[in-house]
């Protein structure tokens, strides 16, 4: 079997694709898989790291306001459609999967027009524009939140699967992870990140928190700034001599970081929330207020209602508030343990298996009809 997977821009679109790819290879080792992405997206680095082939097309997202960028986006859309069609024609896939982001638009549209079996996966409770458009053309739409179904007109195509979790996220033990990361035996680990591109308000808050508590932090900290903001944040924080503070541009080994963590502080993107619950990790969630339909707060509140997370809205975020929330939770081991159990109880760990079964069903139906 030959499969094309397209999705990108942010890790939230790329990691589900990688999880699906690995599961397909596990079930059918002879499968050939090709990713299609853009040079600008994070997929240009993440996909090769996982030893999958990737080809690039030229396409970019549309801005809401009419400008020169809009004209460039239109030009690149037509270019991307042509490039995607050529790649598909040359590769001759048996199946094409989209995991969101503007790059999968030209790919899935072309595949559907070429009568190749197609599937899109939507990670969020409020579907993205690209997936809503593609839903009219593809064979199946896999959703991660049941609330998302109402946004798709043809309900017969929609199947609830949950979000794919990378297999390595489920295979690492806490003890092994802490040893690999060099976390002192009796020291709690807090992992903080704001997404693959970073988050300015979270970064400014955490930078100030570190400046104030360089010598008396009280826990081991792994903190990812996002690559674009790393240099500026390091300049703001100044010299950090503590061996218990590890500041990185990006956490490539998220499996070990999450498995080792006592507490995670992060945004409430769909994939992150799914990984937290699958692993049973307590969290402080700071939903992004800049996303469509405020879907991150909906994700965060769902965990809060289950007693798996504490939610701090960005408008209320300050260094003293965040530090107090972190230290209060770390001191109350019983509460932290209960939060972990609550998170685990709502996690879905077999989404990739569900998606694989849908894939087989699509291909069976295409072959029959």
From Swiss-Prot:
It is a peripheral membrane protein. It is an enzyme of class 2 (transferase). SUPFAM superfamilies: UDP-Glycosyltransferase/glycogen phosphorylase (SSF53756). InterPro entries: GlcNAc_MurG, Glyco_trans_28_C, GlycoTrans_28_N. GO terms for cellular component: plasma membrane. Its EC number is 2.4.1.227. Its main location: membrane. Keywords: Cell cycle, Cell division, Cell membrane, Cell shape, Cell wall biogenesis/degradation, Glycosyltransferase, Membrane, Peptidoglycan synthesis, Transferase. It is found in: Cell membrane. The keyword Transport does not apply. GO terms for molecular function: UDP-N-acetyl-D-glucosamine:N-acetylmuramoyl-L-alanyl-D-glutamyl-meso-2,6-diaminopimelyl-D-alanyl-D-alanine-diphosphoundecaprenol 4-beta-N-acetylglucosaminlytransferase activity; undecaprenyldiphospho-muramoylpentapeptide beta-N-acetylglucosaminyltransferase activity. One of its GO terms (biological process) is regulation of cell shape. UDP-N-acetyl-alpha-D-glucosamine binds at residues 10-12, 124, 166, 196, 251, 296. CDD domains: GT28_MurG (cd03785). It comes from the Bacteria. It catalyses: di-trans,octa-cis-undecaprenyl diphospho-N-acetyl-alpha-D-muramoyl-L-alanyl-D-glutamyl-meso-2,6-diaminopimeloyl-D-alanyl-D-alanine + UDP-N-acetyl-alpha-D-glucosamine = di-trans,octa-cis-undecaprenyl diphospho-[N-acetyl-alpha-D-glucosaminyl-(1->4)]-N-acetyl-alpha-D-muramoyl-L-alanyl-D-glutamyl-meso-2,6-diaminopimeloyl-D-alanyl-D-alanine + UDP + H(+). NCBIfam families: murG. Belongs to the glycosyltransferase 28 family. MurG subfamily. Cell wall formation. Catalyzes the transfer of a GlcNAc subunit on undecaprenyl-pyrophosphoryl-MurNAc-pentapeptide (lipid intermediate I) to form undecaprenyl-pyrophosphoryl-MurNAc-(pentapeptide)GlcNAc (lipid intermediate II). PANTHER family: GLYCOSYLTRANSFERASE (PTHR21015:SF22), UDP-N-ACETYLGLUCOSAMINE--N-ACETYLMURAMYL-(PENTAPEPTIDE) PYROPHOSPHORYL-UNDECAPRENOL N-ACETYLGLUCOSAMINE TRANSFERASE 1 (PTHR21015). This is UDP-N-acetylglucosamine--N-acetylmuramyl-(pentapeptide) pyrophosphoryl-undecaprenol N-acetylglucosamine transferase. It comes from Acetivibrio thermocellus (strain ATCC 27405 / DSM 1237 / JCM 9322 / NBRC 103400 / NCIMB 10682 / NRRL B-4536 / VPI 7372) (Clostridium thermocellum).
């Amino acid at each position: 079997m030959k499969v094309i997977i397209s999705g990108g821009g942010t890790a939230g679109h790329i990691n589900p694709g990688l999880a699906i790819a690995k599961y397909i290879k596990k079930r059918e080792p002879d499968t050939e898989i090709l990713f299609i992405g853009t040079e600008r997206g994070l997929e240009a680095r993440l996909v090769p790291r996982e030893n999958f082939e990737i080809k690039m097309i030229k396409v970019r997202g549309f801005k809401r306001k009419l400008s020169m960028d809009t004209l460039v986006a239109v030009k690149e859309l037509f270019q991307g459609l042509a490039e995607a069609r050529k790649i598909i024609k040359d590769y001759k896939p048996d199946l094409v999967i989209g995991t969101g982001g503007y790059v999968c638009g030209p790919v899935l549209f072309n595949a559907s027009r070429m009568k190749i079996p197609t599937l899109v996966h939507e990670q969020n409770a409020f579907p993205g524009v690209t997936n809503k458009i593609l839903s009219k053309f593809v064979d199946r739409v896999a959703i991660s939140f049941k609330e998302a179904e109402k946004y798709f007109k043809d309900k017969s195509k929609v199947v609830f699967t949950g979000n794919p979790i990378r297999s390595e996220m489920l295979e690492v033990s806490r003890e092994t992870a802490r040893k690999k990361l060099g976390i002192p035996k009796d020291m709690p680990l807090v992992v903080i990140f704001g997404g693959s591109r970073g988050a300015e308000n979270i970064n400014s808050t955490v930078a100030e928190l570190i400046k104030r508590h360089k010598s008396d932090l009280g826990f081991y900290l792994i903190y990812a700034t996002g690559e674009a903001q790393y240099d500026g944040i390091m300049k703001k924080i100044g010299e950090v001599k503590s061996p218990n503070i590890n500041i990185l541009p990006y956490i490539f080994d998220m499996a070990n970081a999450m498995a080792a963590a006592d507490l995670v502080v992060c945004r409430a993107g769909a994939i992150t929330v799914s990984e937290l619950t699958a692993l049973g990790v307590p969290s402080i969630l700071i939903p992004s207020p800049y996303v469509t339909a405020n879907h991150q707060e909906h994700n965060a509140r769902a965990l809060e209602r289950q007693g798996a997370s504490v939610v701090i809205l960005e408008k209320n975020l300050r260094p003293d508030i965040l530090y107090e929330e972190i230290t209060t939770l770390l001191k109350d081991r019983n509460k932290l343990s209960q939060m972990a159990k609550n998170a685990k109880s709502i996690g879905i760990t077999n989404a990739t298996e569900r998606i694989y079964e849908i894939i087989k069903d699509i291909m069976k139906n295409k072959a029959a009809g």
